[in-house]
């Protein structure tokens, strides 16, 4: 299972060439988190990667807080599309 970053960027970008907006970054982090979660189902003792997962979750949380303050409508829409909790 690999992550199709170009498809995620195209889906969540606000304009052509937009790869760094909060929406795109959060969507990419969510895909990486889901990928690592599947990895841990078979590799239970991979503690080194688990530390990286916690870092990704923390980074996504910070971006979600920023997006919620900056653009509430975009935040609500993104939460629904990605299936995240508030």
From Swiss-Prot:
InterPro entries: Ribosomal_uS15, Ribosomal_uS15_bac-type, uS15_NS1_RNA-bd_sf. Transmembrane segments: none annotated. Pfam families: Ribosomal_S15. Belongs to the universal ribosomal protein uS15 family. One of the primary rRNA binding proteins, it binds directly to 16S rRNA where it helps nucleate assembly of the platform of the 30S subunit by binding and bridging several RNA helices of the 16S rRNA. Forms an intersubunit bridge (bridge B4) with the 23S rRNA of the 50S subunit in the ribosome. NCBIfam families: S15_bact. This is Small ribosomal subunit protein uS15.
